[in-house]
Each structure stands twice: as C-alpha cells, then as structure tokens.
Amino acid sequence: SVKDRIGLKMVEKAEAEGRIKPGDTLIEPTSGNTGIGMALVAAVKGYRMIITMPEKMSKEKEVVLKALGAEIIRTPTEAAWDAPESHIEVAKKMQAEIPNSHILDQYSNPANPDAHYEHTAQEILDDFDNSLKMVVAGVGTGGTITGMAKRLKEDRPGITIIGVDPFGSILGGGDEVYPYHVEGIGYDFFPDVLNNDLIDEYIKLPDPESFQMARRLIKEEGLLIGGSSGGVVWAALQKAERLNAGDKCLVILPDSVRNYLTKFVDDEWMDEQGFLETA
C-alpha cells in the first residue's frame, strides 16, 4: 500500500538519528496498512513488531501482519482516540511497560508526510505536465495528502487538492463522530501531520458509494482496489466535472483488494450492511 513508503521512511530516519536499533521493539497504532508497511521493514531489519489495531479492521490485515511476524492487539472500534482502551492509548501503555520499545507514531512523525513530499510527489511531477490541475486523495493521518500537496503546490501553483473524508469523521468538517465501514481514512481527532491549509476543499464520503464504486472498478476496469479507493474515485467524479477539456485529474488509490476479500468484495457482506445494489 501507499503506507509502505512511510514505514520505511520512519524506521530509517529513527535509525539514522540513533533512536532505535535492531533487536528493539516497535509498537505502532494503525488501521492496518502502516502496520503492514512497518512489519515489512521490521522483518528485514530485525525488530520485534507489535501492532495495536481497532476491531473493525479486516481479518485479512491481521493475517498478513501475523505472516510478517508481527504481534497484534485488537482494541474496541468504538473507543475514542484518547480513551484508555483505544489503539493509540494501548500502544502508549505497552511502550511504558516494554524495555527498549518505541512508537514511531505515524500521526505526529514528520517522516510520514516527508516520504510523500520527497518521493510520491516527485513521481507525480515526473509523470505529468502542466495539464495536471487536480489531485484527489483520501485523508487518514493526512501524511499522503499533506506531503504531496506541499510539494505540488510549490511546483504547480494553482493546482487544486481535494481531500476525501468519510461521514462519521471530523477531518473534513463537522463535529459528529459515529461508526463507518470504510477503512484507513477519517478520524475522530486531527493528527499532527495533517495540514488542512494545503487542502483546498473536502468532499464527504458515504459508505455505500465507496464500496459500490470499488466493486464497479474491479468488475469493469480490472482494478483490484480497496474500499477507500472506490470512495476517492467516486469523489473525483463529482469534482472533475468542473475541469476544462485537456485538464487532468490524478486520483490516489492507496491499497489493493487483498485486505477486503471477506468484506465489500463479498455479496453477502454487502447485503448484510444494506450496501448491495439491486439490478
């Protein structure tokens, strides 16, 4: 996923600064993909990896993490971010108890947006000319969109950055927090790495449209993408209508279908949630 980049960047930065060394324990609160990215790096470099992850996140993510040698602690989905039982607070408690353990903390670590400022945005600049007028991306920690937006606005003034945020999250406006099914985007707090000043506007994302579009893209375009990717494409279709002929809109699809085979890909799951489209 897009989070593999920040997993490597955060670990290598901490190593270069002398804060961690192989044999230490890394603990990361995550919705799954950052944990997988860090577990990939931990497996290669010789770190113990502990993941704290809300219950709503897919079984597939847990299976991949275990295959990479990570230890997983599940936490209640309904727990507020600062509640003692939340994935963030459980990680902090474990760090206080385990010697030589570290939370690199994707929510506040500058290496998160830096990975996308230095690499993702550069790849975009290499691949697009000045016809790129709009970028649409989901917002979770905010690292991807913040890093990309900062660099793109430096090089292409006037580019429009659209953030996509689920209903039930506060990142894109509103103060009502409630459960939603799409994974990896949205929060009930504002992560330190998120710079909303770089985001020109938000579009709020309903669950059904997110999963229905993902299923459509799989079936019609052969794009084996995750649920939030479907949501970002749905949002882009709303916003791209205002572009002129020849203008280009880039949409960031952060992960694949692998993590969601027992969720939105499955007709029975979609039907249980009331999301299944009828012919």
Regions found by a protein language model. Name each.
Residues S1-A279:
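PLP-dependent amino-acid enzyme catalytic core
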